[in-house]
Amino acid sequence: MGIVVIGAVFVDIKGYPLSTYIPGGRNAGRIEQVHGGVSRNVAEDIANVELRPTFVGLVDDTGMGQDVIDKLDNHKVNTRYIQKVPDGMGTWLAIFDNDGDVHAAISKRPDTTPLTTLLEKKGDEIFKDCDAIAI
């Protein structure tokens, strides 16, 4: 099975002003929404160097959760051990200033409790042929 990566999935929502950023004011700008989470990023990066990692994690039981799974599948990440659960993903909302620095951010952490049950039930299967684990 090679490398097993265990961890959280986040959706990063990033706002960038089109003109001078006004703290506390209304700012026109562009907004990006990307899949994130350090562990998810690591699994995708490992796959990008043509290794075939297994990702063990949680996603929301929504279309966005399915999008995360689909993108990892497209990168040839084994997604068999990703569970869809309510509140399975975190969210990071960040506002950047004109210099590209984070001016404000709010982070909602996911409930990772279901990972314990998944590892108790399928841990032997997940790790039996693994060479390395990244948490």
Q: Each PLM stretch: what is its role?
A:
Residues 1-56, 65-67:
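Glycine-rich phosphate/adenosyl-contacting loop at the front of the ribokinase-like
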Residues 2, 131-132:
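Structural motif
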Residues 23-26, 48-131:
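Conserved N-terminal subdomain of the carbohydrate kinase-like
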